[in-house]
């Protein structure tokens, strides 16, 4: 029996196992050594049990898979060939690990006899992603000495560990030949005989029973709910954010929200008004802070958390540490709505009114300072004007803009907002946005900085695969404007931090055959958006602005609000 046939049998069992674990998207890069895996993924697609996506750039492919997994909330498989193709997945693996996004990385490998002997495209791939995967499976070369049941069991157990997210790396060595295997030879191979009934049924090999862990009410909750408290809400899935705002309002507690929280802010612009030392000192009089979620963007929110020394509780639905300030705290590993049910509120009047007064003052002052020109700050402040009312998702890239959006906007509750704030890199943002469009099957709006766009230009090719409207805002402030916030000499900052490029993006759009517009006013933008939303294709909207506009407005708002005198 040809080795090419058994390579395919081995790959069939791997992908059949992953399919039963919820994998329906297979992201495939070109390569010969991964042929057995690629052809079996194609077979699943032909049978209506999966969708294959392709991209020529493995780094972008990894982030594309990350985006699909974020939006679909299901594991996504990535298939790549051996060599440095595998290493290009590392940034996406890091981001997935930091944010608990389920990815399954399938790296084809040379067989052991071709390693460390000068063979082409053969590198050391076993455990190459170090501690970032939750499981690293180094499979042997395909051999009938290992039963199909063993292979399924190994993969099934790893997938069970992935139920709360994270990355699984499966390294699969294949010896040649890799081609010319007949489907009938594969399906009728004796090695598969003991699992034929399993292959005809859509069920997991190992049936894990759900563990229902009831949230226990804190034994001193009746006392703590009478105290002065603050609710801090960080990054949460939209389905976990329900009920938090109402609960906080009933308690009369201050609630501070991150733009990633999917909770409508009752005290918007927190990253601005927390610069006010008078109000911050009064907030520090709180007796308890309860944190839902994590990954706070705002610098002032993080400074407040670092300063707070009182009782601290964290509600987070995984085992990860999410307290960079190392409070002595009480940890509840629970979904927020389960925790809220176990900790009923006590209706009280607000214990502190100054934040509300300051937030209202901020609203008027921000509107005045931002003005009516089309710039970073006005886009962030009026971000809801850019978005369709329904059936759409928003992706915010890692640049100055995400900080402005967090500080200046009031997003609607439960509007789907995605970010890559695990490692907060600027790599792979376009690819992630394209994946989110695929995973959500909804209209996409993405706000991405110019340097981030230049870093991931290859990924514009992915947008040709979309079948829905997608709007990519490229915020072109001629380099890394986020570094304008640093206390560095201007000349040094320009050359070594900002790195101005003096480029524009119309020719990039033409290269990838995407629509392009460059509006100069809000009226121009309204016309462009109306056209873009009517087309089932991608439009690049370049907002070219003065380099320092956004950072200057941001710094000025923080300075002015920081010294404002607010009476109640």
Swiss-Prot record:
Disulfide bonds: none annotated. GO terms for biological process: menaquinone biosynthetic process. Its cofactor is Mg(2+); Mn(2+); thiamine diphosphate. Transmembrane segments: none annotated. Its EC number is 2.2.1.9. CDD domains: TPP_PYR_MenD (cd07037), TPP_SHCHC_synthase (cd02009). Keywords: Magnesium, Manganese, Menaquinone biosynthesis, Metal-binding, Thiamine pyrophosphate, Transferase. The keyword Transferase applies. Pathway: Quinol/quinone metabolism; 1,4-dihydroxy-2-naphthoate biosynthesis; 1,4-dihydroxy-2-naphthoate from chorismate: step 2/7; Quinol/quinone metabolism; menaquinone biosynthesis. InterPro entries: MenaQ_synth_MenD (IPR004433), MenD_middle (IPR032264), THDP-binding (IPR029061), Thiamin_PyroP_enz_TPP-bd_dom (IPR012001), TPP_enzyme_TPP-bd (IPR011766). Pfam families: TPP_enzyme_C, TPP_enzyme_M_2, TPP_enzyme_N. It catalyses: isochorismate + 2-oxoglutarate + H(+) = 5-enolpyruvoyl-6-hydroxy-2-succinyl-cyclohex-3-ene-1-carboxylate + CO2. The keyword Acetylation does not apply. GO terms for molecular function: 2-succinyl-5-enolpyruvyl-6-hydroxy-3-cyclohexene-1-carboxylic-acid synthase activity; magnesium ion binding; manganese ion binding; thiamine pyrophosphate binding. Gene3D superfamilies: 3.40.50.970, TPP-binding domain (3.40.50.1220). Binds 1 thiamine pyrophosphate per subunit. It is an enzyme of class 2 (transferase). Catalyzes the thiamine diphosphate-dependent decarboxylation of 2-oxoglutarate and the subsequent addition of the resulting succinic semialdehyde-thiamine pyrophosphate anion to isochorismate to yield 2-succinyl-5-enolpyruvyl-6-hydroxy-3-cyclohexene-1-carboxylate (SEPHCHC). Homodimer. Belongs to the TPP enzyme family. MenD subfamily. This is 2-succinyl-5-enolpyruvyl-6-hydroxy-3-cyclohexene-1-carboxylate synthase.
């Amino acid at each position: 029996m040809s080795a090419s046939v058994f390579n395919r049998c081995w790959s069939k069992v791997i992908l059949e196992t992953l399919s039963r674990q919820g994998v329906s998207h297979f992201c495939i890069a070109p390569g010969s050594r991964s042929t057995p895996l690629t052809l079996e993924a194609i077979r699943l697609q032909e049978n209506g049990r999966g969708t294959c996506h392709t991209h020529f750039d493995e780094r972008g492919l990894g982030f594309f898979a990350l985006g699909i997994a974020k939006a679909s909330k299901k594991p996504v498989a990535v298939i790549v060939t051996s060599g440095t193709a595998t290493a290009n997945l590392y940034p996406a693996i890091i981001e997935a690990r930091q944010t608990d996004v389920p990815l399954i990385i399938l790296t084809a490998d040379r067989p052991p006899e071709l390693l460390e002997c000068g063979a082409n495209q053969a590198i050391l791939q076993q455990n190459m992603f170090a501690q970032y995967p939750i499981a690293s499976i180094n499979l042997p070369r395909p051999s009938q000495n290992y039963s199909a049941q063993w292979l399924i069991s190994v993969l099934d157990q790893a997938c069970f560990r992935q139920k709360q997210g994270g990355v699984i790396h499966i390294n699969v060595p294949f010896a040649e030949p890799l081609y010319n295997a007949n489907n009938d030879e594969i399906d009728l191979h004796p090695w598969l005989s003991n699992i034929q009934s399993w292959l005809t049924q859509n069920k997991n090999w190992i049936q894990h029973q759900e563990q229902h862990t009831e949230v226990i009410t804190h034994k001193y909750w009746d006392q703590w709910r009478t105290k002065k408290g603050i609710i801090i809400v960080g990054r949460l899935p939209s389905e976990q954010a329900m009920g938090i705002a109402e609960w906080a309002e009933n308690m009369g507690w201050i609630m501070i929200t991150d733009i990633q929280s999917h909770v409508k802010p009752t005290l918007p612009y927190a990253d601005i008004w927390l610069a006010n030392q008078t109000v911050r000192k009064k907030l520090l009089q709180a007796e308890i802070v309860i944190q839902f979620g994590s990954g706070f963007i705002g610098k002032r929110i993080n400074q407040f958390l670092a300063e707070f020394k009182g009782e601290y509780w964290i509600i987070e639905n995984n085992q990860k540490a999410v307290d960079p300030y190392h409070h002595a705290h009480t940890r509840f590993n629970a979904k927020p709505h389960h925790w809220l049910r176990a900790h009923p509120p006590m209706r009280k009047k607000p214990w502190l009114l100054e934040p509300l007064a300051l937030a209202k003052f901020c609203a008027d002052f921000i509107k005045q300072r931002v003005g009516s020109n089309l710039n970073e700050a006005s886009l962030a402040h009026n971000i809801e004007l850019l978005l369709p009312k329904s059936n759409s998702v928003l992706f915010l890239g890692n640049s100055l803009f995400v900080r402005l959006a967090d500080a200046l906007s009031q997003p609607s509750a439960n509007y789907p907002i995605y970010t890559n704030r695990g490692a907060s890199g600027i790599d792979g943002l376009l690819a992630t946005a394209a994946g989110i469009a695929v995973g959500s099957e909804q209209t996409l709006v993405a706000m991405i900085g110019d340097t981030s766009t230049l870093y991931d230009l290859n990924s514009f090719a992915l947008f040709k695969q979309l079948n829905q409207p997608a709007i990519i805002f490229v915020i072109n402030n001629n380099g890394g404007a986020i570094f304008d916030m640093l206390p560095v000499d201007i000349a040094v900052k320009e050359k070594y931090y900002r790195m101005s490029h003096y480029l524009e993006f119309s020719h990039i759009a033409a290269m990838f055959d995407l629509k392009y517009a460059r509006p100069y006013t809000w009226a121009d933008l309204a016309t462009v958006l109306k056209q873009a939303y009517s087309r089932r294709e991608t439009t690049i909207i370049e907002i070219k602005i003065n380099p320092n506009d956004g950072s200057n407005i941001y710094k000025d708002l923080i300075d002015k609000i920081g010294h404002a005198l607010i009476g109640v």
